[in-house]
Amino acid sequence: MKLIAAKRVRQLPAGFTLIELLVVIAIIAILAALLLPALSRAKVKAQRIACLNNENQMGIGSQVYADEDDSHALTGVCNFGDDDLNWLYPQYVPNLKVFICPATHHSISNNPQPVSGYVQTRRNDTGKTYEQRLHDNSTYIPDLEEIAEDGTAYNAGTKTGPGTSYEVSGFINGNNSTAASATWTPNVRKTQNVAANYIYQNILNYAVLGKTLTFNLRGQKASPSSMWLIYDGDDAVQYPPGGKWSNNDYPDYIDNHGTDGGNIVFCDGHAEWVLQARYPATFAFGTEEEVYQVYPYP
């Protein structure tokens, strides 16, 4: 007689109930809400560090440039308003990406032009030709001549446009017009000797957010570690279009790193992060520019 084994019925696991599913979704939403700000902050910090690395490379390049320069000048700009960075490329900083802050969408086209065709439109306070200031480099990159914020095609909302992300502070006590036709007394070019021995000339009164900040620098000896050389580009921009102008040389939300602050290269070659609250004071000692105003923005 055959024995017929009873078939075992395998029970399938019960599915999630609607309530359990909603609880899981709620937990995922809470975790995302907690993690996303942290990830955003980590991204911002990483961009800031990468930008600082860019400036460190430019700081090292400026020291080598000065060592090889006949006047031991720390930059190759023609006056205090000039932000041209061609004097660094390619001899001292060979990578064009170094001139773009990773917190922006600025761009630089690698299209070398002959220096022989360069037309000087700014006042030249150096006594040197453009080719001499480029240390006999025969070409230049047009997009390295100015910061992206100054370009006519710049979009402040997306931080997009051709040009560099960094300004140059090649002269101390900069308070004169930089037009080619100007005949006023030139400012003092930052050389290795000037950075080590300069005596401040002015008492500065800065209007900052409704307060007057006074910096009595006159007679004090400057230091290479406090004098600015290169910094996060920060010119005044009208944004939104037709709206208020942002502040010049003061971190606003549309600037490279927003209102947090900015990276700065000093005349001794080191670079550091400077918080927004410290910006006016470091700007005073770093540039000795007489005119400085900060208004609420936006």
Question: Which residues make up each language-model segment?
Answer:
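Generic hydrophobic-segment detector
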Residues: 5, 16-22, 32, 60, ...
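Short, well-structured segments within or immediately adjacent to enzyme catalytic domains
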Residues: 49-298
